[in-house]
A protein has these predicted regions:
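Alpha/beta enzyme core
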Residues: 2-194, 199-250
Length: 250
């Protein structure tokens, strides 16, 4: 319970960092490497695939809040019973890589079934697909909020390819998700977490747009060594802290 309390505290302070191992990443060695790097780098939560073994492994080896991602309500119920701290409807990148697009109606249906199954005594986060029209994103976010979802995650880079290299390319990838964050923050009361293209360069943009948290995936989980992963997480966490400190001084 302490882990999720710490995440909620960071969420309230608008500086929470969640590291995403991947909805389709069932490689226990890699997931543990990402989770340990997330903790050592100062992140607040780790997001893993729906597997009892992975949940047990991460809980036994870290003190992070454990998010479990799936689009199957039954798997999310299993995750709750296995000790997950939060349930994530998403992340959808694995589906996009297969050419599958998930609709607003599908997300809402999954959320409804999940809430019915798991109740309201565990944090539920839902990803709003970045490829749908922004007006539909807003409507979906409002419907999810009315349903009792606690946290909205945005996305964007799955449908946007960067045209530039370096820092400019990173910004191009993140800009759609950041823009979606601005709109959703204006239209819902629950916190918003920005994901897709988030790095130490783009994380401050997300918080400036109104996000309460960032979800960071490929820039960490695609690295080969735990040392590299830890350093990357640390750079993101430090960028977030620096952004918050600057905002407080203004």
């Amino acid at each position: 319970m302490k882990a999720i309390a710490n995440f909620k505290k960071a969420l309230k302070a608008k500086k929470a960092v969640k590291i995403i191992a991947g909805i389709d990443n069932f490689d226990a060695e890699n997931v543990l490497k990402v989770a340990k790097a997330a903790e050592r780098g100062g992140a607040d939560a780790i997001d893993i695939a729906a597997s009892e073994d992975l949940i047990k492994l991460v809980r036994e080896n870290t003190s992070l809040a454990v998010f479990v991602s799936s689009t199957d309500p039954e798997e999310l119920l299993m995750a709750k019973n296995a000790g997950a701290d939060a349930l994530e409807i998403g992340n959808f990148d694995a589906y996009y890589r297969k050419g599958v697009r998930i609709s607003a109606e599908e997300v809402l249906e999954i959320a409804q079934k999940t809430v019915e199954l798991v109740g309201n005594d565990i944090m539920i986060c839902a990803t709003v697909p970045g490829h749908i029209d922004i007006s539909k994103q807003v409507k979906l976010a409002q419907d999810l909020e009315a349903l009792g979802v606690d946290l909205i995650q945005t996305e964007g880079s799955a449908t946007v390819e960067a045209q530039s290299a370096g820092a400019r390319g990173l910004i191009e990838k993140a800009i759609v998700s950041v823009a979606n964050t601005v709109e959703l923050c204006k239209n819902v009361e629950i916190p918003v977490m920005t994901a897709s293209g988030i790095t130490c360069t783009t994380a401050p943009m997300a918080f400036a747009a109104g996000a309460s948290a960032v979800g960071v995936g490929s820039c960490v989980n695609k690295l080969s060594s735990e040392l590299e992963m830890t350093a990357t997480v640390m750079s993101i966490v430090n960028a977030v802290k620096a952004e918050k400190t600057s905002a407080e001084l203004v």
